[in-house]
């Protein structure tokens, strides 16, 4: 399953390369890295030069997120959240509990050309919704979410 926002610029040949590398490294959840001038909320999602892909402890909810079929029974359907803030740190905890490798594909960086964050909605309301959603649920703390487990420079 591939979830794509409406404000993302994908490079030529993106889909085949992205899915090939996500599959090659066995990522259960994957996202493309952000280009240098792309809006990225998390430093770990920024492109790393000379790296094809990285196994990380976190995959962001957007602007592009891929889910392997094996995750569907656990992660779908998505909860009824307005903005979805906090869902990705919860997914990261679930992935860790299940031993699922997750990661960022650096070889196909995208540009998230979004409007300024929270321009179309209340940032305070989104934060309150995230806090409410995460209360009583497992989630990966920010410091852990920023960690890279392994960097892959070749696909073989």
Please state what every model-predicted region is:
Residues 1-9:
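Short beta-strand-to-loop acidic/aromatic patch adjacent to the donor-nucleotide binding site
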Residues 2, 30, 103-105:
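Hydrophobic/aromatic beta-strand patches that form the interior of the parallel beta-sheet core
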Residues 11-86, 92-93, 97:
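Conserved catalytic core of nucleotide-sugar-dependent glycosyltransferases
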Residues 81-156:
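C-terminal catalytic/acceptor-binding lobe
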């Amino acid at each position: 399953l591939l979830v794509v926002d409406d404000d993302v610029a994908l490079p030529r040949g993106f889909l085949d390369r992205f899915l090939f590398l996500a599959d090659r490294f066995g990522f259960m959840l994957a996202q493309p890295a952000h280009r240098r001038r792309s809006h990225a909320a998390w430093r770990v999602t920024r492109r790393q030069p000379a790296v094809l892909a990285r196994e990380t402890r976190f995959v962001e909810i957007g602007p592009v997120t891929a889910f392997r079929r094996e995750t569907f029974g656990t992660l779908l359907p998505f909860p009824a959240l307005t903005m979805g803030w906090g869902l990705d740190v919860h997914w990261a905890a679930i992935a860790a509990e299940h031993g699922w490798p997750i990661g960022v594909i650096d070889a196909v960086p995208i540009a998230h050309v979004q409007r300024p964050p929270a321009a179309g909605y209340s940032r305070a309301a989104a934060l309150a919704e995230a806090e409410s959603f995460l209360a009583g649920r497992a989630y990966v703390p920010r410091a852990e979410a920023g960690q890279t487990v392994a960097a892959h420079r070749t696909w073989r």
